[in-house]
Amino acid sequence: MSGRSPKALRAATANDRAQDRVRGLVIAAHGRHYIVAPEDGSAILQCFPRGKRSEIAVGDQVLYEPTSADQGVIVEIGERRNLLYRSDQYKSKLFAANLDQLLIVLATEPHFSEDLLGRALVAAEENELKPLIVLNKIDVEAALPLARKRLQLYRGLGYTVLEVSIKGQPDAARATLEAHLNGHSTLLLGQSGMGKSTLVNLLIPDAEVATREISTALNSGRHTTTFTRLYPLPGSEGALIDSPGFQEFGLHHLTEGKLERAFPEFRPLLAECRFYNCHHLHEPGCAILEAVADGRIAKERHALYAQLVHEASQIVR
């Protein structure tokens, strides 16, 4: 019979568990199921969060305790540089953590949503991520002039727009994209039909094999993009994180103060408003509204700001 007290036994057990903990990188997420790649390069395994709440994201560095050869429990999330997510009145949807940049995939056709583009840019600015806009399918010549015209506003704001034809000119597209992606952790966002999956397959030759491996580990049986997953970029320290296509991008969690600073064209004017607590909606002496009136700020950009402020006001904080 052990001579140690129950308290000492509990401490010893906790110490044993701590010694069993392994560092890893979350490379896929689907619901409360996560795939973790161990730091030592051993086989990936399925992990679950400890407790009911789960705030784990792809790109997180974690500590987990193995519970079997291919499963474990995540017990700690490492310090994050950032966390990108979207939210509505009721819930949040995590995209990824520890990012450097955001790659927003658009196409000449089908018609892309400028509202979603604008929201993605705001999210990037608020998280201090570099946004890259990719215009795909430039070989569809009839639709190209209108797409370019719609993106002129964003070029004028200083955003990088990369024009590619992933299917028509794959080698040129690969060279263009790799020049901007290598060495960086990049989240890929886009509506369905824009060519996001084609882009992944272009840059990650074994993407389909990796997807099947993760699907098997998640026991999902599905080989479509129903989960967010991270791919190491071949020959680079960078990573590409692919997320499911989406049709909404709520930013209800952003306060008015964060929103005004997420519009780069607003920033130089914020100190010029007559009132220090100006909302930039209908106040007299508002430098932002004056810039909208004389064309220095696009009306559609201010309309997006006003809509986001309205949405944020619906949240009880």
Swiss-Prot record:
Cofactor binding comment, as recorded: Binds 1 zinc ion per subunit.
CDD domains per the UniProt record, alphabetical: S1_YloQ_GTPase (cd04466), YjeQ_EngC (cd01854)
Matching Gene3D superfamilies: Nucleic acid-binding proteins, P-loop containing nucleotide triphosphate hydrolases, Probable gtpase engc, domain 3
Protein localization: Cytoplasm
Main location: cytoplasm
Protein family per UniProt: Belongs to the TRAFAC class YlqF/YawG GTPase family. RsgA subfamily.
HAMAP family: GTPase_RsgA
Record-given protein name: Small ribosomal subunit biogenesis GTPase RsgA
